[in-house]
Amino acid sequence: MVLSCELTLKELLESGAHFGHQTSRWNPKMKPFIFEEKNGLYIIDLAKTLAQLKKAVSCIQKTVEQGKSILFVGTKKQAKQIIKEAAIECGEFFASERWLGGMLTNMATIRNSVKTLNNIEIDLASSNSVLTKKETALLAKRHRKLLNNLEGVRHMNSLPGLLVVIDPGYERIAVAEAGKLGIPVMALVDTNCDPTPINHVIPCNDDSIKSIRLIVNALKDAIIDTKKRSGFEILSPVRPIERPAEEIVEGLPLPNEAQNDANSKEGFLVWTDTDNSEALR
């Protein structure tokens, strides 16, 4: 069964999806998706937007049916809350605060950062902790920074099958990493962007909150419908980490004995700021 996109041209129009950038800021490669120039702005052809969106929904359906995960990427202010909420609702991964370099091309480092986050959470929750108030405060601060950057990908143990990007110009590093690894990219693309590296272009206003929400929700609904029809469980990407008991020693996980020996105090791990610096910036 092929899912259909239920959005209408009227809904796209009311969301402002047709407003492109000023004519002085356009990318000529977006010309096929432009309807006209009006008052110094390029107007996007919403008939083509709708056609591309229907193709995108079909791509989403196939990706989910194959059991592959999807990573939503949108770190600019208009997009971050929208993609976070959508990803959580449909049980997919997201990067909404900051794209960490190597999130795809150097997953081992990112996974180490996630392990550090998990370890800190266990330390903070330990009833046996002898950390001072100052040490606890420093640990809590570090936890907030790590969680802020890794919350949406902490359960992503393998590469996603598809990236859904809001504004590929703004998220060019994420797009480049996906390209290197052959991961297809679906993106909301405005008239100032280069659509060349994008596998599935959805031409639209990528600065309008209404436009972004309308289209992202259509993709989210396609994911949910496909999962329900296929019998797949919808798991929140921000669910708590479950750690086996053997990973915890005296109330604390010991991921690296040498690190523990070098940075321990009274049997408890003292986390240094030299670890996972990229995730903490």
Curated annotation (Swiss-Prot):
One Pfam family recorded for the sequence: Ribosomal_S2
GO-annotated molecular function: structural constituent of ribosome
UniProtKB keywords: Ribonucleoprotein, Ribosomal protein
GO biological process: translation
InterPro entries: Ribosomal_uS2 (IPR001865), Ribosomal_uS2_bac/mit/plastid (IPR005706), Ribosomal_uS2_CS (IPR018130), Ribosomal_uS2_flav_dom_sf (IPR023591)
PROSITE patterns to which the protein is assigned, alphabetical: RIBOSOMAL_S2_1, RIBOSOMAL_S2_2
Protein name listed in UniProt: Small ribosomal subunit protein uS2
GO cellular component, one term: cytosolic small ribosomal subunit
Family statement: Belongs to the universal ribosomal protein uS2 family.
